[in-house]
Swiss-Prot record:
It comes from Listeria monocytogenes serovar 1/2a (strain ATCC BAA-679 / EGD-e). It is a peripheral membrane protein. Belongs to the ABC transporter superfamily. Energy-coupling factor EcfA family. ATP binds at residues 40-47. Disulfide bonds: none annotated. It comes from the Bacteria. Its main location: membrane. SUPFAM superfamilies: P-loop containing nucleoside triphosphate hydrolases. PROSITE patterns: ABC_TRANSPORTER_1, ABC_TRANSPORTER_2, CBIO. ATP-binding (A) component of a common energy-coupling factor (ECF) ABC-transporter complex. Unlike classic ABC transporters this ECF transporter provides the energy necessary to transport a number of different substrates. This is Energy-coupling factor transporter ATP-binding protein EcfA1.
Amino acid sequence: MAESFVRLEHVFYKYEDTEKYAVKDVSISAQKGEWVALVGHNGSGKSTIAKLLNGLLFPEDGLIKIGHFVLSEKNIWEIRRQVGMVFQNPDNQFVGATVQDDVAFGLENHGVPHDTMVERVESALNEVGMQSYALHEPARLSGGQKQRVAIAGVLALQPDVIILDEATSMLDPRGRAEVMETIRIMREQEDITVISITHDLDEVLFADRVIVMNKGEIHSEGTPKEIFQQADAMREIGLGVPFIIELQEKLVAGGFETGSTVLSEGALLDQLWKLNSNN
């Protein structure tokens, strides 16, 4: 098995104003190109992990490694060159007068030559489907469009890892779907590792692997299907399950045979059709 590209080993962290650990003995790994979702309530430690991964915070104990670099004061800029972050509120991320200016901002800070910058901005906007908005003012975009531009700004820097820190929590369902589809396509094309920090259980279904956080510790880990087959355990910590899982539970409770657990409405319809056709 290939060595993990992102690795946390026995990481501890607590904020200065509290004695309680925000992250307690957490070990997480992610392969190159893998999508890992961290899910949990507010205060579960998931957003603290996002800040630790980008070097915004340093662990009190334990090791964090991105690629070939261990997080330290010496390697902080090497880490940040490899890790891009998309935050919760897109309005807090814009600094340019136009969409293309905003995407170019990070490249300017990195001293990227102008010709290369133009190519990267165009490529990144094309990748997120926003090239036709290049000269628009960011303030005039919808929430979903703003987050796609924020993702383009990160993509232009060509990171190995993108962290989505509650990146869809302020969006309506349409905007959320736009952003998730953008991330899905981006990961397939660029082989980027995605770490999504979320409390949106439907968003978790896009991930290859899910890590459930509770009170600063890892509660459970597995594929989305494995995690949501443990519906009662999720409810015990107050998280619940996605709508598609609830629907299957209600069908079973009503006496319908649904077969194995599936994670999309289309797959459920196909399964119900096949079962009904055989009766």
